Amino acid sequence: WGDEGKGRVIDLLAENADIVARYQGGNNAGHTVVTEKGKFILNLLPSGILHPEVTCVLGTGMVIDLEHLAGEMEAIEARGVKVEPENLKLSDKATISMPWHKVQDGLEEDRLAKKGGAFGSTRRGIAYAYSDKYRKKTLRLGDLLHLDEERTQNRLHMILDAKNMELAGCYHQEPMSYDALLNWCRQQAAYFAPFICDVGAFLQQAHDSGKRIVLEAQLG
């Protein structure tokens, strides 16, 4: 399925919504929306972001490439679209697509290609982010708010040790340093902290008060 208008339907519904909540997927698919400001291609942001009165949510079930999201936000802001904590809320329980997820995706695709069995991956690390989510070996957005806590730092060490063993053992990659990882996390926290919240409580309150909520999946 593709190019038959799923995103267009969501955009039409978003015009009359109070909230558009994306609840799963990552940035390996997207949709195109055309407004009076031109054509926008969105991979992570819900199409409701183009409507100034709509609040958008990236929910718990998503895996979020934060660098891609920042680029998407800045690109539409440069064209006059408001992106602020008041109209974009990120779940504190959403999974972070870490830098190594794309690396691992690309390395595995290359390995399989040599054997004639490549999947045709987008190389954006979505499958690996979800895999680590269910193995409890990655971070959630809420962890960015607690980087100075010993518990979070211990978790970072545990996750990094496991990932370095995978990348070194399977793909002969040089290990990543803890300091570089912590610095990357701090950069993401500085940018995204104002947007991170308990979106479950936000949506429950909105539902109870009669707000119109549209749920958007990865493909529409």
Task: Mark where each language-model region is.
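Non-transmembrane, aqueous-exposed alpha-helical and coiled segments at domain scale
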Residues: W1-G220
